[in-house]
UniProtKB/Swiss-Prot annotation:
Component of the condensin complex. GO terms for cellular component: chromosome; nucleus. Transmembrane segments: none annotated. This is Condensin-1 complex subunit CAP-D2.
């Protein structure tokens, strides 16, 4: 019997001589690479013959084993035929060996002698191992060889393909691996003595199988992948190789994203084949036990793990539902990818894990509770902190709606959540929310019509039906809620749901049809008999749910309108799709919102335009041409001016593409000509509008109906619908050149008479006249051969009409009082019309002159081109070049152009100013207009006249430079001071036109133009932003130093203005090298000096700095802003500069520049907010800094903190020194006053006597308190002037009794000087006894004095104009000298008190002697 075979670690290990000599090894291997091809082929044939001819166990023989080993060792070098022979021999022997295992088991039952059976089992086991080893080794070696070839040169790659094609390796590989998988699936327990196989054998197979799983190419082969999945499933499940398999699976999942789906397949197959989910459960629990923080670090692994869980939940929903609890804690982890995966898992489980209706009531109840818990988690995750998770939850809900797994009980809650997510700050969440609402509409259980009125009418009917069915005592009760009408899992029964849908589609369809606003009649709604009370209640509950859903969708319409203005293209596209779906289901407000998609046709984003065009086609273009025409003309009728421009753009595109067919055009003509019954004048006008739009791209459309346009457009129907005349004027301008000639020949004079009557007549309403006259004048200048002649006639006729009326009014005036106001309201209206007409004619005359010049130039070019071509032959080429050179030298080539330019300038100048001393017709009107506009008192009485007059004035200014210059002051006066915001707004727009036309004239008025940004009117500010944006972005105006005004508009209270300002700076940042970079320091300085709230300043700077992206600009800004510190001394500006610095993105160079500029801002570090901003910069710098830079930043931080503390200490010391200095001055003044007091005391001692006004200290005599009043009453002064206090020999004690501080010294002096009426107590020879014992704070000395002075002035008014100097009074308050003073040092206080005490004693002695 051969020795046992033991799986080696590597193939070459079989050549090593075993120590125990008790295993099979290769004793005499042959080097087949050294054999000649013929010898090698003979060698392989011999091995194959032995394997096939001899018994299966011959592979144990040493000779056969050595030869097979030799071939396997050098398998990659064998020719294809040899490879194929060897593989076939090994595979066929193993395939025959496997069925013999069953025969062994039968032999065990039949024979009594066990020894031969044991030998046979051993031989079978040995042969199985050897065949398995060699076959799997061949697979691994060949795959290794192929992989190495793929990574080498292109030539080697071609060789690989040749190898594979020559012997077709892939099918061989699949068959070999399937055979190995079969060997594991049969009963091997008899061979290995137990259900667990040999560890060495199983480990070898599993290890190599997982290695093959790492090759994506192998997994693409279905047969190979199936074999590998079977091997892994059998090993882990049947032979309990769980731990090692789980470790290998987790490694594969984390490292190879392509293997995730295949691993999930393998695990799911193992569970289904062996009805044992141990492998899946073990993997789930391993994932659940993993620390959530590990997934934060390994993002790729987290993504793969999440995908695996979702795939597993899809394949094994029931098993996953019972083990999902171990994964739920990961909802609290930081990895959003794992949370996304868990959300996906719950979605799969809700859809698939609870569909089984079998089981007892307790199991059903448990399943329902589990499902409800999962749904609650899904609802809760809609508010996840991560936008990716919120988006994924909404996607899961959409999948559940598609699979009809959302109950009606939850339907409205999900819809409400989704509608709320439409306002999410993340674009991906908004996209998912829009898709969810689209899906909910598409799969809603309430029917195809979701109009609120329909549901309300139906609901009311069934409530009445319920009241009839219920007993009388319950008739007044409310209908049950959703929960009462639902079954155990929160879903309304299918019967009731189907009934609801059928009723809503069938019986309610008639009530949903009216489109003209008719109320739904109760008679139109039939209520079918649906059964008993409970069924009726369930139906009512479902109708109420449908009503709430319809209201929820209708309430989201304003949000969808906002999303259509989003900067994200996906928002716009999906909002349009949702609106289209809403219109399909007749959601209230959807059609009105869809009208607002028209302006999006001008979007530069191609995807948005395509979405708009597709929506337009699907909504308005129908199969029936008449329906299409009716849809289009109704759209034209209801559209405003902006929408009509967009509609024209779309119609042109659709006509060019053929989407609007000729039959639709014919239907539009039928509507215009009233050939369709019931057509109104308004519909006729709408049809003509669409035809006019279509004619822009296809003018031939109008040629066949010229007479109809004149007859109907200006006929009796124009009286009914005045706008029809305006539309007809627009259509005339779209005529082709050929059609214009036809028109002039057939109906020219008639048409011009009609147009003249439109302009000069009075039959058009006031609100329509101006638009109609505009189009009529333009039409005249478009088709008339000499439009200036007709225009002259129109002006004269209009002028005579206006002033003839005035003369008639004057003739009829009899009294003096009636002459005060000649211009009646009728005359004002006519004058306004006249001014509009004459100014519009002047503008069209200017355009007409320019078009004539261009026409002459085109004709000249067209004429010169053939002559130039004929001269440019080879013979005349040299002569032509010589003539051209001579003409160029003489200037003859440019003389024609110069002549045309001169003629054009002269013609333009003659429009308003005239070419001679006498002014022309329009020039006379301009003079009158200029005087009229200066009559402010008249115009203030008639605002509508002022609007027309200023509009006309602006038009004349645009035409003529000299007229513009002479009236600029007037225009800016009106734009600043006019009470009407309409006038100011129009003039603001005109300033933009003037700046384009005459930039040099407007340049000195730049500041005044920027001032319009501060206007109180919203429309004026908005127009100012638009005008300035246009001028600056098109390089028509220099930014100058007023751009900060635009920056302030970023924080405007009106969102529209704020958005326009932001858009301006966004577009400005795209120009050149971003001008905002250069403007930012100036804007910062200007905003710092303005009275702008700190929050507004921060928002403005944050937005502006956010538009600067380049690192070099950021680095330069660091230096610029640091240098601004040295130029300002205000703490507020320091704070603003430092805040702006903190908004910058700091690179390594930026940090270094900040550190190098320390001297520039060190003086500002005393401010706490400045220091905080620098600390913010430091904290940001630490996050990205390298170790070397981080050390510098930390050192810089210490320096900042140190200087901040030093500056704070210096400020404190300076304040204390100032206090001390003021205290010293006060004490010195006390000493001087005491010395002054000594002189009168000494004179008294010599016998001069006591002054009548002198008093003794109140503390020495009790009767002294009332002395002042007594003496002042007895001896009043006759002097008119206030006596100097020095004459009274006393001082004002309240000035000497205070604690002083230098903090507010400057502020106090004016306050003292203002007390002119305050009496000096020295005048009466007394002091204020109340002030003698008062202790006051030195910080508020002056404030206290001023308060006392004010109170004294109220009590004792004085006629004195001058306040006496207290220093001249010869007395002080004795008690005040012993008070404590603040801010002084102890030694100085003692010296001062000693000095003061001697004077006190002298005063006391003098008082006692008296």
């Amino acid at each position: 019997m051969a020795p046992p075979f033991v799986f080696p670690q590597i193939l070459r290990a079989l050549e090593e001589d075993p120590e125990d000599n008790h295993r099979l090894f290769a004793q005499n291997p042959v080097d087949v690479t050294s054999l000649r091809p013929s010898d090698l082929e003979e060698f392989v044939k011999g091995v194959s013959f032995d394997l096939s001819d001899r018994e299966l166990f011959c592979v144990e023989d040493q000779d056969v084993f050595d030869r097979v080993y030799s071939l396997v060792r050098s398998f990659f070098s064998l020719p294809p035929s040899c490879k194929c022979n060897l593989v076939e021999s090994l595979r066929s022997n193993l395939s025959v060996l496997l069925p013999n295992v069953d025969s062994i088991s039968r032999s065990v039952q039949d024979q009594e002698d066990d020894v031969p059976i044991i030998d046979r089992i051993t031989s079978h086991r040995n042969a199985l191992k050897i065949y398995t080893f060699f076959l799997l080794t061949v697979v691994m070696n060949e795959e290794s060889h192929i992989s190495s070839v793929e990574t080498t040169k292109v030539a080697a790659r071609g060789r690989k393909k040749q190898i594979i094609q020559s012997w077709n390796w892939e099918p061989q590989r699949g068959r070999m691996l399937n055979l190995i998988a079969n060997s594991l699936e049969i009963n091997l327990s008899l061979l290995f003595g137990s259900s667990d196989l040999d560890e060495n054998y199983l480990s070898f197979i599993v290890k190599n199988s997982f290695t093959l799983f790492e090759n994506a190419t192998i997994l693409k082969d279905a047969e190979t992948k199936d074999a590998l999945c079977r091997i892994i499933g059998a090993s882990a499940t049947k032979y309990h190789y769980i731990v090692q398999s789980c470790a290998s699976i987790m490694h594969l999942i984390h490292k190879y994203d392509f293997a995730v789906v295949h691993i999930a397949d393998a695990v799911a197959r193992a569970e289904s084949k062996y009805s044992d989910g141990t492998l899946a459960v073990t993997i789930i629990r391993d994932i659940g036990r993993t620390d959530p923080k590990a997934y934060v670090k390994d993002t790729a692994g987290a993504d793969n793990v999440g995908r695996f869980l979702v795939e597993l939940a899809d394949r094994l929903p029931k098993l996953m539902s019972t083990n999902v609890g171990v994964l739920v804690p990961h909802f609290g982890g930081e990895s959003y990818k794992i949370r996304n995966a868990l959300v996906g898992v719950l979605g799969k489980l809700v859809a698939k894990a609870f569909n089984d209706v079998e089981g007892d009531m307790s199991s059903k109840s448990l399943r329902l509770r589990t499902k409800q818990a999962m749904l609650e988690i899904l609802l809760e995750r809609c508010r996840d902190v991560s936008a990716y998770t919120r988006s994924r939850v909404l996607q899961v809900w959409a999948e559940l709606c598609e699979e009809h797994s959302v109950s009606i009980g939850l339907w409205n809650e999900v819809a409400s959540l989704s509608a709320g997510r439409l306002e999410d700050k993340s674009a991906i969440v908004r996209k998912s929310a829009l898709n969810l609402l689209i899906m909910m509409l598409q799969h809603n259980p309430f029917g195809p019509q979701l109009r609120i009125a329909s549901f309300e009418a139906t609901l009311e009917q069934y409530k009445r039906k319920l009241n009839e069915l219920e007993p009388t005592e319950h008739a007044s009760k409310e209908s049950t809620s959703d929960g009462e009408s639902c079954n155990g899992d929160g879903e309304i029964d299918d019967l009731h749901l189907e009934t609801t849908t059928k009723i809503h589609q069938d019986s309610l369809s008639d009530s949903c049809q009216p489109e003209n606003g008719e109320e739904i009649s109760e008679k139109d709604v039939s209520v079918p008999d649906i059964g008993n009370v409970e069924q009726t209640k369930a139906l009512i509950a479902s109708l109420e749910a449908g009503l709430r859903f319809s209201k929820c969708m209708s309430a989201s319409m304003p949000i969808l309108v906002q999303l259509m203005a989003s900067s994200s293209a996906t928002d716009v596209e999906n909002a349009i799709l949702l609106l289209m779906r809403c219109k399909q289901f007749q959601i209230d407000g959807a059609e009105a919102c869809l009208r607002k998609i028209l302006p999006l046709a001008f979007s530069q984003d191609k995807s948005i335009y395509e979405a708009v065009e597709n929506a337009f086609i699907s909504i308005y273009i129908r199969k029936n041409p008449v329906d299409t025409a009716k849809q289009l003309l109704n759209l034209a009728i209801d559209s405003n001016i902006g929408d009509q421009a967009a509609l024209e753009f779309i119609v042109n595109a659709l006509v060019s593409k053929g989407e609007i067919s000729s039959s639709t055009t014919s239907a539009l003509w039928d509507f215009f000509c009233f050939n369709i019954n019931g057509t109104t004048a308004e519909q006729s006008r709408g049809a003509l509008s669409i035809l006019c739009m279509a004619a822009k791209s296809s003018p031939r459309i109008l040629g066949s109906h010229i007479q109809d346009i004149i007859d109907i457009g200006f006929g009796r129907w124009a009286k009914v619908e005045p706008l029809l005349a305006r539309t007809a004027c627009t259509v005339i301008q779209r005529f082709s050149e050929e059609d214009r000639k036809k028109l002039l020949l057939s109906s020219g004079s008639r048409l011009f008479g009609i147009l003249e009557s439109l302009i000069t007549g009075n039959w058009l309403p006031e609100n329509i006249y101006y638009a109609t006259a505009d189009k009529a004048i333009s039409a005249i200048y478009m088709i008339h051969p000499t439009p200036e002649t007709l225009a002259s006639t129109i002006i004269k006729k209009s002028l005579s009409t206006v002033f003839d009326v005035v003369e008639q009014e004057e003739a009829q005036t009899d009294t003096e009082n009636n002459k005060v106001d000649i211009l009646t309201p009728v005359q004002v209206a006519k004058l306004s019309r006249f001014l509009f007409a004459v100014s519009h004619i002047a503008m069209n005359q200017l355009v007409y002159i320019e078009s004539c010049i261009q026409k002459i130039r085109r004709q000249k070019t067209k004429k010169d081109k053939p002559a130039a071509e004929s001269q440019n032959t080879e013979e005349n080429l040299e002569a032509t070049q010589e003539n051209n050179g001579i003409n160029a030298e003489l200037g003859l080539a440019a003389s024609d152009d110069a002549l045309l330019d001169t003629l054009a300038e002269r013609a333009e100048r003659e429009i308003v100013s005239g070419g001679s001393v006498e002014k022309n017709l329009i020039g006379e009107c301009a003079t009158f207009l200029s005087k009229l506009c200066r009559n402010f008192s008249l115009l203030q009485k008639h605002p509508e006249l002022q609007a027309s007059a200023m509009l006309a004035l602006c038009r004349f200014m645009i035409i003529d430079a000299s007229f513009c210059e002479s009236n600029l002051q007037l225009l800016f006066t009106v734009v600043e001071n006019a009470p009407s915001e309409v006038v100011r707004s129009n003039c603001t727009l005109s300033l933009g036109d003037l700046a384009v036309r005459f930039p040099n004239l407007l340049e000195p008025w730049t500041e005044n133009m920027y001032a319009r940004l501060r206007d109180a009117s919203v429309s004026v500010r908005k127009n100012a932003v638009l005008v300035l944006s246009h001028l600056i972005l098109n390089d028509m105006m220099k930014v100058k130093g007023y751009i900060y005004e635009m920056a302030i508009c970023i924080e405007d209270d009106v969102e529209r203005i704020s958005s326009l300002a932001k858009l301006f700076f966004h577009e400005l940042s795209k120009k050149g090298s971003n001008p905002i970079y250069n403007l930012l320091p100036d804007i910062l300085g200007q905003l710092s000096n303005r009275n702008l709230e700190r929050e507004s300043f921060c928002n403005v700077m944050q937005f502006l700095i956010g538009s600067i992206k380049k690192d070099k600009q950021m680095e330069a800004l660091v230096e610029k802003l640091c240098n601004r510190f040295s130029g300002v001394t205000d703490g507020k500006q320091w704070e603003y500069i430092s805040y702006s610095l903190s908004l910058l993105t700091f690179t390594e160079k930026g940090i270094k520049k900040l550190i190098e500029s320390f001297k520039s801002y060190e003086h500002a570090l005393a401010e706490d907010l400045v220091t905080e901003n620098f600390r913010s910069i430091i904290n940001k710098g630490k996050k990205f800094a390298k170790p070397e830079l981080k050390a510098c930043i930390e050192e810089f931080e210490e320096k900042i903190n140190k200087f901040h503390m030093e500056k704070k200490e210096q400020e404190e010391t300076a304040r204390n020194a100032e206090v001390h200095r003021e205290k010293t001055k006060t004490m010195e003044s006390l000493a001087v006053l005491s010395k002054v007091k000594e002189e009168p005391v000494e004179e008294y001692d010599e016998g001069e006597g006591v002054s009548d006004s002198e008093i003794v200290d109140p503390s020495m005599e009790e009767s002294g308190d009332n002395l002042v009043e007594t003496e002042s009453e007895e001896e009043p002064s006759d002097s008119e002037e206030e006596p100097d206090s020095a004459q009274c020999g006393t001082a004002i004690p309240r000035y000497l009794n205070q604690k002083t501080s230098g903090d507010n010294l400057i502020e106090t002096e004016p306050e003292e000087e203002q007390s002119d009426s305050e009496p000096d107590s020295a005048q009466c020879g007394t002091t204020n006894p109340r002030s003698l014992n008062r202790k006051t704070s030195g910080d508020n000395l002056i404030e206290t004095e001023s308060e006392e002075e004010q109170s004294d002035s109220e009590e004792e008014p004085s006629d004195s104009e001058e306040e006496p100097d207290s220093a001249q009074c010869g007395t002080t308050n004795p008690r005040s000298l012993n008070q404590k003073t603040s801010g002084g040092e102890e030694g100085e206080s003692e010296s001062k008190s000693t000095e003061s005490s001697s004077s006190i004693r002298r005063n006391l002695r003098s008082g006692s002697r008296s």
